Amino acid sequence: MRELVNFDSGERLRLSVEDKALVSVSQKGGKTKQSKKEFASIDEAKKACVKKEWESLKKGFILQDSEAKTGEASLHVYIGGGYTGALSFASIKDEIYVYKSGGQKDGGKPSDILVKLDRSGAIKEQIALPKPLAWDAQCANENLLLDLDHEIYIFEPKEAKFREILAEQNVKKSSEIASFICSANNAAVFGMFGQIFIFCEGLILKIGEYKCSTKNHVPILCAALSADASMLALCTKENELQILNAKNGEILSELRAEFGVLDKICFLDENTLLLRQYLENKLFCLDIKSAKMTKQPWIKDEYLRASEFCAEAGKLVVIDQSRAYAINLKSGNVMAEFTLDHVVKCCEAKFIDGKLAVRTDYGCFSLYKI
């Protein structure tokens, strides 16, 4: 059942379009109210329904749909504070932490927060961040790693505390400002100020260093961990990638191909990387053993521009602004093609318990059935 729920007031709201009318059914305190508003056409009624749903989300209602089909949202929560480029979130057990840009408080101090949700979408807590701008958030071993304006912090939910890794590891700030975090299999590898660390079983170990080339004054840096966290793919130069042993930083191979500048990579399996070209947003596959590069084979759209993508357990989702494609990597078939709600230009996406989780630039956090 698709309904809007307000956990604070206890109100439940169901919206539907019947013929050319918007029908609202509200339940609160054992009482039911129904209203019906006629429109000139079905399309106008549908637009009014979408508008009413969005207005309700902004008032604190949460959309839940227990009967969502493939490509449909099972959850919408209005977070607000969307900042293009910093739409980070991550999940730990039954909790989801979503970054919210809070602008400025009185006195000019930043008020950026982590919004903690449970799986029903209820907001359980709002946690003040020690620094603004959470560019990325990843989970490892029940901890949250945060890239806060290019400095890495670890948030420990059980202790409700932030660990400042810069101070812990005595990392000296340098001109190497580009940073990264990637996680898999309860481990994480992160880099800041030219130094690479692994975080595993609560311990932090330095495993290497990096130096970024630049393209149009922008540092080249992206990284990915293999599913078993044994390999780190690292790109710091145009047309060049390194595969490192993620445990000790040993260079396993150096790959050179005409892929240009990359801004996102991920492992599809232990032998294949998915690459996104900087600015062009085109996707390519790279064979790690042969360094052979091929165009993505799944989506038959020469105009495809991948604003976002994510892969997990044999599934890949590619997003072009608000258009999403879910792909079965084993068969190579597109399982579903659907439109994401509440996206203006971009979003961040990850898999959470088999569902597609999306944080949009319009201020929403959603789960979609895949």
What are these regions (language model features)?
Residues 96, 144, 187-188, 232, ...:
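Hydrophobic beta-strand positions that form the internal "hydrophobic ladder"
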Residues 9-35:
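Short aromatic-glycine-(Arg/Gly/Cys) micro-motifs in beta-strand/loop hairpins
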